[in-house]
């Protein structure tokens, strides 16, 4: 399972929101590049960047910070937040971003999403942010009437590379992921699903790992890493590539006679 640290940018700073509430932004660091290097040093193989300002305005706001991270690190970076045009997708890919996350446009401009998936195969992820099962848009400030499962089926047909599923009520709360919603989503589509929101412990990660055979291939961790409830190293050892259970014990002798 891919363990992906999150860096959410608001006003150039690394923050975490509580249930998507911008008024409850908690600042954890003022040096995004330094934070990215920290996660890299602890074993990160991919980063998840979100321009929270951009998610609200629909325009790039934290471009300088994101560019600095992408250019400084030699690991893949996925970026979302206010990406609502082909031009913006091209700008991010030209910058060196590995995958671009589309959210609001998946609801408002499905034809654009289909066209982008066709033009950039394997590079477009869809962020499905759900509030009580319905998809939220525009930085989670609005809630549509579209069910998350319905959107998932639509973007699968459009050719998306995968889905990032966030339960807004769990995000930033450390209350554990919504396993039932993830299980249901995974049963509806044949796409890689990355879980996001609520992870607070190694136990939560192990519960998610059980769903890996159903299509939940990764997890984005934010608040728990910043608060110290989980270390990235321990998370990777528990459910990441080369996890403890995948490494045979060193018995001090060969088992082959």
Swiss-Prot record:
It is found in: Cytoplasm. One of its GO terms (cellular component) is cytoplasm. InterPro entries: Aldolase_TIM (IPR013785), His_biosynth (IPR006062), HisA_bact_arch (IPR006063), Isoase_HisA-like (IPR044524), Isoase_HisA-like_bact (IPR023016), RibuloseP-bd_barrel (IPR011060). Keywords: Amino-acid biosynthesis, Cytoplasm, Histidine biosynthesis, Isomerase. The active site is at residues 8, 129. SUPFAM superfamilies: Ribulose-phoshate binding barrel (SSF51366). It holds the Pfam family His_biosynth. The keyword 4Fe-4S does not apply. Its EC number is 5.3.1.16. The keyword Amino-acid biosynthesis applies. GO terms for biological process: L-histidine biosynthetic process; L-tryptophan biosynthetic process. Pathway: Amino-acid biosynthesis; L-histidine biosynthesis; L-histidine from 5-phospho-alpha-D-ribose 1-diphosphate: step 4/9. GO terms for molecular function: 1-(5-phosphoribosyl)-5-[(5-phosphoribosylamino)methylideneamino]imidazole-4-carboxamide isomerase activity. This is 1-(5-phosphoribosyl)-5-[(5-phosphoribosylamino)methylideneamino] imidazole-4-carboxamide isomerase. It comes from Cyanothece sp. (strain PCC 7425 / ATCC 29141).
């Amino acid at each position: 399972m891919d363990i992906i640290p999150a860096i959410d940018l608001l006003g150039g700073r690394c923050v975490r929101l509580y249930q998507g509430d911008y008024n409850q932004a908690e600042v954890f660091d003022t040096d995004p590049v330094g934070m990215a290097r920290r996660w890299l040093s602890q074993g990160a193989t991919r980063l998840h960047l979100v321009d929270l300002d951009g998610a609200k305005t629909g325009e790039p706001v934290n471009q300088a910070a994101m560019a600095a991270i992408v250019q400084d690190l030699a690991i893949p970076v996925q970026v979302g937040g206010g990406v609502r045009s082909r031009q913006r997708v091209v700008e991010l890919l030209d910058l060196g971003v590995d995958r671009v996350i589309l959210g609001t446009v998946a609801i408002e401009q499905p034809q654009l999403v289909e066209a982008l998936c066709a033009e950039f195969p394997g590079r477009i992820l869809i962020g499905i942010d759900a509030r009580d099962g319905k998809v939220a848009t525009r930085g989670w400030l609005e809630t549509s009437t579209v069910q998350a499962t319905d959107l998932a089926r639509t973007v699968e047909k459009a050719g998306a590379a995968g889905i990032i599923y966030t339960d807004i009520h769990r995000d930033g709360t450390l209350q554990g992921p919504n396993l039932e919603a993830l299980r249901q989503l995974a049963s509806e589509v044949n796409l890689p699903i990355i879980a996001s929101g609520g992870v607070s412990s190694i136990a939560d990660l192990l519960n998610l790992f059980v769903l890996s055979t159903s299509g939940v291939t990764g997890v984005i961790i934010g608040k728990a890493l910043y608060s110290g409830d989980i270390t990235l190293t321990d998370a990777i050892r528990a459910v990441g590539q080369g996890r403890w259970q995948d490494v045979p014990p060193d018995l001090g002798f060969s088992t082959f006679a």
